[in-house]
Amino acid sequence: ASLFNAPRV
């Protein structure tokens, strides 16, 4: 997983 792979919700 990448560092900016988290969904921004």
From Swiss-Prot:
Signal peptide: none annotated. Dorsal ganglionic sheath of fused ventral nerve cord. One of its GO terms (biological process) is neuropeptide signaling pathway. The modification Valine amide is found at V9. Its main location: secreted. The keyword Heme does not apply. It comes from the Eukaryota. One of its GO terms (cellular component) is extracellular region. It is found in: Secreted. The keyword Kinase does not apply. Keywords: Amidation, Neuropeptide, Secreted. Belongs to the periviscerokinin family. Mediates visceral muscle contractile activity (myotropic activity). This is Periviscerokinin-2. It comes from Musca domestica (House fly).
